[in-house]
Amino acid sequence: NTAFNSIAVIDADGTVLGKYRKTHIPDGMPYAEKFFFTPGDTGFQVWKTKYATIGIGICWDQWFPEAARCMALKGAEILLYPTAIGSEPVLLKDSKPHWQRCMQGHAAANIMPVIASNRIGKEVQGDSEMTFYGSSFIADETGEIVAEADRKTPGVITAEFDLDAIAKTRREWGVFRDRRPEMY
């Protein structure tokens, strides 16, 4: 039996569009997920929904810029990252700003909004404890955070984007036009 960390992609009308299986599985403490999950085999994909073409990475995938760029090249208009991140026992400081800046960079580099959801609360297993810091956020195509939830309470955040205007800006910047993949 193989277990994957997966997400089902369901459109606004309830149509199941597909699934994505998490590509990057962390192995270090406290996220020793390789004991439980197999790295995904779906590759990064995009789905055309009623509202936008979306790309989805799960948690640890967000730390890999290649994932965001791959989905952007496949036509994503918005990137989504459902996440479970919190206090890092191996770090002596709060990782929340680094976590947010990483995805703000994906938004700015790919000139598209990024939506990152994160859980809240505390999980205790034996002597180990982890507090998830919430702070779900939405960044616009420049990477600016335009909506953010707090660290401790459940919440819903929203933002509206003119995807046609963002696509025009993306073309004008020429980031995708001027790529040189033969040099990478």
Model-derived regions, located:
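Active-site catalytic loop in hydrolytic enzyme cores
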Residues: 1-78, 82-105, 172-173
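Conserved hydrophobic/aromatic beta-strand scaffold that supports enzyme active sites
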Residues: 6-9, 19, 44-46, 116, ...
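Short helix-loop capping/hinge motifs at secondary-structure junctions, enriched
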Residues: 15-17, 144-146, 167
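CN hydrolase (nitrilase-like) catalytic-core segments centered on the catalytic cysteine
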Residues: 59-157
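Acidic, His/Gly-rich catalytic cores of divalent-metal-dependent hydrolytic chemistry
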Residues: 161-164
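A conserved C-terminal secondary-structure "cap"
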Residues: 166-184
